[in-house]
């Protein structure tokens, strides 16, 4: 009879630690190129902790300017030019603000949190009038809204405010003071078909001490009863912004015109504050 042949699998040996690629041995300019392909949050949270050399690269300007230079669109080129012009002087003990900027991506997106009430009243400072604020589904779709829900007011003025800290969102003072950015604000308001309503919007640009730098207000005519569940949009762009802006205060009011108990007042949703690079 034939003999049995053992076919036991031989385990693959572990690689020699010395054979593992050590990126720290790369020349700084080549390591910089490699790191520029790593996501910004990973650079800040992990790569920066590897060693002093990596920390110096992540804290420096060159890495982040390399990331920005990869966007060849007109907006990308405009941003790169603006960033180069208004970066603060490099300091060994202070990380380049472009790191937080690239990680948080504050330009071109809505900086208002919970704009449609999808999280209830979270992030808003509210003053309840009548029966107070509630959140309901939209009676008609609102274009571009992240959620088809809205904040609904009552028979007495209901107020709601959110203050956006622009530096906390990833912008830096020299960029805000450069004259190269503008602030676009927008709000949608409407009524239910069987009740008229009133609406107010107040947007204020504030400095670090909460002093007013610029402001905009909208006091449109009331929407009448039997209005086909209409929604209207209010927009404004702050351009040529004066130096010192650090906060945007966004506040709107609403109430009904029938003075009915319950929630028949102005319906507000899809509020937005967007910072963008001036193209002209």
UniProtKB/Swiss-Prot annotation:
**What InterPro entries does its record include?**
F-box-assoc_dom, F-box-like_dom_sf, F-box_dom, F-box_only, Galactose-bd-like_sf
Q: Which Pfam families does the entry mention?
A: F-box, FBA
**Domain F-box per the UniProt entry, residue ranges:** 20-67
Alphabetized SMART domains for the sequence: FBA, FBOX
Q: Tissue expression, per UniProt?
A: Detected in brain, heart and muscle.
Any one GO CC term of this protein is: SCF ubiquitin ligase complex
Give the multimer and partner information. Part of a SCF (SKP1-cullin-F-box) protein ligase complex. Interacts with SKP1 and CUL1.
Q: What is this protein called?
A: F-box only protein 27
């Amino acid at each position: 009879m034939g003999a049995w042949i053992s076919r036991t699998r031989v385990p693959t040996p572990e690689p020699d630690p010395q054979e593992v690629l050590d990126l720290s041995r790369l020349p700084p300019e080549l390591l910089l190129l490699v790191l520029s392909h790593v996501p910004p949050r990973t650079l800040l949270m992990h790569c920066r902790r590897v060693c002093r050399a990596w920390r110096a690269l992540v804290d420096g300007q060159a890495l982040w300017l390399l990331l920005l230079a990869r966007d060849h669109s007109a907006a990308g080129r405009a941003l790169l030019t603006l960033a180069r012009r208004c970066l603060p002087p490099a300091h060994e003990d202070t990380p380049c603000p472009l790191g937080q900027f690239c990680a948080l991506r504050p330009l071109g997106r809505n900086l208002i949190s919970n704009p449609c009430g999808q999280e209830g009243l979270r992030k808003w400072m509210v003053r309840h009038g009548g029966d107070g604020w509630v959140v309901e589904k939209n009676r008609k779709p609102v274009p571009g809204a992240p959620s088809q829900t809205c904040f609904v007011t009552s028979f007495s003025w209901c107020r709601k405010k959110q203050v956006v800290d622009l530096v906390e969102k990833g912008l830096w003072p020299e960029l805000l003071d450069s004259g190269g950015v503008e602030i676009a604000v927008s709000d949608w308001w409407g009524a239910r078909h069987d009740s008229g309503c009133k609406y107010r919007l107040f947007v204020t640009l504030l400095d670090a001490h909460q002093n007013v730098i610029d402001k905009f207000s909208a006091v449109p005519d009331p929407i009448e009863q039997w209005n086909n569940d209409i929604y209207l949009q209010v927009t404004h762009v702050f351009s040529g912004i004066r130096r010192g802006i650090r906060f945007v205060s966004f506040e709107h009011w609403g109430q009904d015109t029938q003075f009915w108990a319950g929630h028949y007042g102005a319906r507000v949703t899809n509020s937005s504050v967007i910072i963008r690079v001036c193209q002209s």
